[in-house]
Regions:
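Acidic/aromatic-lined carbohydrate-recognition and catalytic surfaces
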Residues: 75, 103-119, 207-227
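Proline-centered turn/helix-capping motifs that create local helix->coil transitions or kinks
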Residues: 239-248, 321-329, 364, 430-431
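Aromatic (Trp/Tyr) and acidic
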Residues: 27-103, 111-112, 127-190, 194, ...
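Solenoid-like repeat scaffolds
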Residues: 375-382
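Hydrophobic, small-residue-rich alpha-helical packing segments that form membrane-like cores
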Residues: 311-315, 319-322
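Bacterial Sec-dependent N-terminal signal peptides
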Residues: 1-21
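Carboxylate/His-rich catalytic cores and anion/metal-binding grooves
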Residues: 222-245
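Short coil/linker segments at helix-helix boundaries
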Residues: 198-230, 263-269, 287-306
Length: 585
């Protein structure tokens, strides 16, 4: 009792006398927390024993707790203390106060606290649509004219074929701008589409009720599927109808300047067919086909068209299993030189696994399942654009009840390995400086590291769906906390969400328009000690190697394959909040 009274009296003094300034050293999820979920703040380089939760005006102290620490990462000398206020469940808006240091950004505690993020991360894909104007009704102040109709695309010399020789003009409209540039890449669309189609398959009721104000809203299909169809219809046009092969990308010869889409009018090409493109195409269209069956009355015949195209591309890939995209070699042989994103993948074993799995699930034809080795080794690599093995595993787990018995042994292996991965991800979580799965190793901080955090979260959610172990879902939630501000940089990495967010992302429409605010809902790439862009960074420490500057395409660019796992992560946690007990009904 004496200790509690002392803490209370100290709280009265501390909050009023020492905490009249906001401190960047206090890191919180700037969006907020669910009432009954874990709630943690991290305090950098300031030793503290106690913390308080107060109203934003500091007038009322509502909770006092004991901080723990110090914690640090093996690659950094920075120490943190953790303030765990999970037991504080009152809804409202609050700040964390550290005596003699200051107070945090305000945050909300409420049910559905991440719904705006789930909506915005999905709506971001609408803002990246090409071949259509974005009117004020749907885009607000980010309205713009149409860019890149892609109705006059030239077949590049590298893609020349008997029925489509060099210089042939084809039409391949729609799709999304891939990243900060204005090109479209089939390989990167693969993991992007697969991740978001999986979100819809895993949480169909949630997404059927999630509307984001796009032109198709209210047409009888979920908005996530409406948005995916914009890119799917472009992907279909990337298949050569004469042989089933798929062009690797649709691109200008070089990157466009810092222009708005309608002003970027250089000639565009479809470039070389590749095995990786064909297999990504196969997987996406096979998965899309089974989802579209439910909407046959709205998009008649599209499900059949998708599975037929998927099989056609698979057959091409089987006949051409090692056609790799090597841009430098291609440029030595053909003109004009193409120097945009390569997405060259020299190992397509995982793409064969994923494509075969999706064909097997959709068609029921076991020849696809038996055509690949699902377990070439024991690895469980977190997905990325050039590593899609786990997408195959996730689909098999998702459809376990619909599969023939001969597949059950493989599914049990996947369950065991996924649970092992989940345990590795959350091991020693409480001793990490920001109480996040992300950042346990400097290897997490690659180009697009924030997508690593989001994809780690997806792995943990799949483990939760498989086992019911809430520790895995908590781990996924902690990575969302990381992305929303509880990290070494202090940034909430999603544009328009939080109080300190990237304002100068490497994204041409956001840079070239006259608005100070970037397009909302976009996930910045995140800390990258490789610093390949040569910009000035504030730190070489892996988890701090981020700069909010247009020049930093290595840490501050956006990309569809980084946003897609954010869509899944934020939407899944929203969908699961009541079943997991994070929020009351």
């Amino acid at each position: 009792m004496t200790r509690l009274l002392s803490l209370f009296l100290l709280a009265l003094v501390s909050v009023s006398a020492f905490s009249q300034r906001r401190s960047e050293q206090i890191r919180v999820n700037q969006t907020g927390y669910y009432p009954n979920a874990p709630k943690i703040a991290a305090i950098r380089e300031f030793r503290t024993d106690i913390f308080h939760i107060t109203t934003p005006d500091l007038a009322d102290t509502l909770y006092t707790g004991t901080a723990t620490g110090p914690n640090s990462a093996p690659y950094s000398e920075v120490e943190t203390w953790l303030a765990d206020f999970s037991n504080f469940t009152a809804t409202g808006v609050y700040v964390v106060v550290i005596p003699e240091l200051g107070y945090s950004w305000p945050f909300e505690i409420s049910a559905a606290v991440h719904e705006p993020l789930a909506k915005s991360s999905l709506k971001a894909f609408y803002f990246n649509r090409m071949s259509t104007p974005l009117p004020w009704e749907y885009a607000g102040k980010w309205a713009r004219p149409a860019g890149h109709p892609d109705s006059h695309v030239m077949v590049h010399a590298s893609a020349s074929a008997e029925n489509r020789p060099e210089g042939t003009i084809i039409s391949a409209p729609k799709g999304w701008y891939d990243a900060g540039d204005y090109n479209k890449y089939v390989v990167n669309s693969g993991i992007t589409m697969g991740t978001m189609l999986s979100a819809l398959e895993d949480f169909p009721e949630y997404y059927k009720n999630l509307a984001v104000n796009i032109p198709e809203t209210g047409n009888g299909m979920p908005d996530i599927l409406n948005e995916l169809l914009w890119n799917l219809r472009w992907m279909i046009r990337m298949q050569d109808p004469y042989d089933g092969g798929v062009y690797h990308k649709l691109t200008t010869a070089n990157f466009e300047g810092r222009l708005m889409p309608a002003e970027a009018v250089n000639q565009r090409y479809v470039v070389q067919k590749s095995t990786a493109a064909a297999l990504n195409f196969t997987a996406v269209l096979a998965q899309a086909s089974r989802i579209l069956r439910e909407y046959e009355n709205i998009v008649p015949g599209l499900a059949d068209s998708c599975i037929n195209a998927a099989v056609y591309a698979w057959e091409w890939a089987v006949e051409n299993p090692q056609i790799y995209y090597r841009q430098n070699d291609m440029n030595r042989q053909y003109d004009p030189d193409i120097v945009t994103g390569a997405y060259g993948d020299g190992n397509v074993t995982d793409e064969f696994m994923w494509a075969a799995t999706e064909l097997f699930i959709t068609t029921g034809d076991e020849k696809y399942f038996r055509s690949v080795n699902l377990f070439p080794d024991t690895a469980m690599p977190i997905p990325s654009w050039n590593q899609v093995r786990l997408l195959a595993y996730y689909s098999l787990l998702r459809k376990e009840d619909d599969l023939p018995k001969f597949a059950s042994g493989n599914i049990e292996i996947i369950k065991i390995r996924l649970e092992r991965l989940a345990n590795e991800l959350i091991e020693d979580l409480g001793s990490r400086p920001y109480h996040a799965v992300m950042g346990s190793s400097p290897r997490d901080f690659v180009w697009g590291s924030n997508s690593v955090a989001a994809n780690q979260g997806i792995a943990l959610i799949n483990a939760y769906l498989s086992t019911g172990n809430r520790r895995y879902l908590d781990g996924a939630l902690h990575n969302l906390d990381y992305l929303a501000g509880r990290n070494a940089t202090g940034y909430s990495f999603v544009t328009g969400h939080g109080h300190r967010t990237p304002m100068h992302i490497h994204h041409r429409p956001s840079d070239a328009d006259p608005l100070p605010d970037p397009v909302p809902g976009l996930l910045a790439g995140g800390p990258n000690p490789g610093q390949q862009d040569g910009c000035d960074y504030p730190s070489d420490i892996p988890d701090e190697s981020f700069v909010d500057d247009w020049c930093s395409y290595a840490s501050n660019e956006i990309a569809i394959n980084w946003n897609a796992p954010l869509v899944y992560l934020s939407g899944a946690i929203e969908a699961l909040q009541f079943d997991a007990g994070y929020s009351g009904r």
